[in-house]
Amino acid sequence: KGKIRQIVSADIDFNAKVLRKRMEERFQSYDFKHGDQLYMSFRSPVNGYLAVYLYDGQEMVYCLLPYIRQEDGCFSIKRNEEYILFSPDGSSSDIVDEYNLTASRDKEVNLIYIIFSPNKFTKALDDSSGEELPRSLDYKSFQKWLVKCRNKDVEMRVQRKTVKITR
């Protein structure tokens, strides 16, 4: 004899990989050297929306996706399509931002937040920090935004990837 209960939400099993220097999945890595190019592969079984943020481990969070030139504040994902993010070789080459990871100390640890939902959501309110850096906000404001989004959207999923950068 079993019990019946309502499924509130099923996990969306998306696939996100951090790639170092090359745009192929075999170059998945969490260990970077100062100046290495950052790419990310992403695939989802459902249509949805994606945002990617990088926390510098100190006080700032940088919005890597949606791209700076995207005016609508969200990045759309089509189900079962493979995306290589931060690469100029894709269909969105006119709006892509490319990133090199840098370290101001001998060793740094950063967190990459990969945020996906089948429901439309808008990126956090952030500020432009100049041409060399992506838009940013402080860590406390980012956490407040993320908690608010997750409370409103039970289907939102967040993966955190730890990235080490050495000089």
Go through each PLM region and give its residues.
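Secretory-pathway glycoprotein ectodomains that are cysteine- and/or Ser/Thr/Pro-rich
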Residues: 1-167
